[in-house]
From Swiss-Prot:
GO terms for biological process: DNA recombination; DNA repair; SOS response. InterPro entries: AAA+_ATPase, DNA_recomb/repair_RecA, DNA_recomb/repair_RecA_CS, P-loop_NTPase, RecA-like_C, RecA-like_N, RecA_ATP-bd, RecA_C_sf. ATP binds at residues 66-73. Pfam families: RecA (PF00154), RecA_C (PF21096). Belongs to the RecA family. GO terms for molecular function: ATP binding; ATP hydrolysis activity; ATP-dependent DNA damage sensor activity; damaged DNA binding; single-stranded DNA binding. One of its GO terms (cellular component) is cytosol. Can catalyze the hydrolysis of ATP in the presence of single-stranded DNA, the ATP-dependent uptake of single-stranded DNA by duplex DNA, and the ATP-dependent hybridization of homologous single-stranded DNAs. It interacts with LexA causing its activation and leading to its autocatalytic cleavage. This is Protein RecA. It is found in: Cytoplasm. It comes from Acholeplasma laidlawii (strain PG-8A). Transmembrane segments: none annotated. Keywords: ATP-binding, Cytoplasm, DNA damage, DNA recombination, DNA repair, DNA-binding, Nucleotide-binding, SOS response. SUPFAM superfamilies: P-loop containing nucleoside triphosphate hydrolases, RecA protein, C-terminal domain.
Amino acid sequence: MSDNKKQQALELALKQIEKQFGKGSIMKLGDGADHSIEAIPSGSIALDIALGIGGYPRGRIIEVYGPESSGKTTLTLHAMASAQKQGGTVAFIDAEHALDPNYAKALGVDIDNLVLSQPDTGEQALDIAEALIKSGSIDMIVIDSVAALVPEAEIAGDMSANHVGLQARMMSQAMRKMSGVISKSNVVAIFINQIREKVGVMFGNPETTPGGRALKFFSSVRLEIRRAEAIKQGSEMIGIKSNVKVVKSKVAPPLKTASIDIMYGTGISRSGEVLDLSVELNLVNKSGAWYNIGEEKLGQGRDNAKQYLEDKPELLNELEKKVRTHFKLTK
């Protein structure tokens, strides 16, 4: 078969697969993202770029997972604040009973208008989530976390009783019921998940996420967030650098990574993201340890350059605007 005929046959096969399994079920890694999909910005410029469509896709299920203290909740709080800034209504299902209102407020969440539920059981949490989504009144719902969605039978049962597979069955049923409703209501549904170790795995990756396989399958986007290093000021630890990898995406080519600075008390560092992306686009020159724009020196070392931008909000805004224009991102 000639190269031309092979290409035609491949295009035909791709069209048939998309027709049968839906748009985004198959794509070439070099293909552009589907920009017709409406998205809510994630609150991180670097992550919006990695996601390919400028944020979290509406009408889809998103899974954010990672080890403890890697920044999962911070990432979702920024997304919630972003949805509210666009005039949207946000619901937070706090199955872990661990939401810190003061921290949420510091990250820009309007806690007075946040719809909050702290359910007693997993079934109750998912029923409340389904009812809110069906109402068509919310734009984003966050479930924190899948690991904390404990089935009622497990709570009511004896501590020594065997409850293998209960949570997986509960999640599987919930995903089947909710996926269609989420799509019709155009809501962004974010499930936060933890990482567990599989017992007895000798080869391959021993890590897995709780809740069975249903969430993996039904998610249009899966984000893995991992802590890379500590950010220190002298001997004091003031934040962490985390890497967010787009492990799965049905709306854009996956496997892209965003590196973000999470500062304690204030969340994702806007100046850090703008600085790194400005260097990448040659808007800021980096020579050795020095950062400069033409004759204007921003500072020696990344931390000093970040501080310079924070002290000059006009310059920071100007650079951010240029970065957003280049990557076709909305505010």
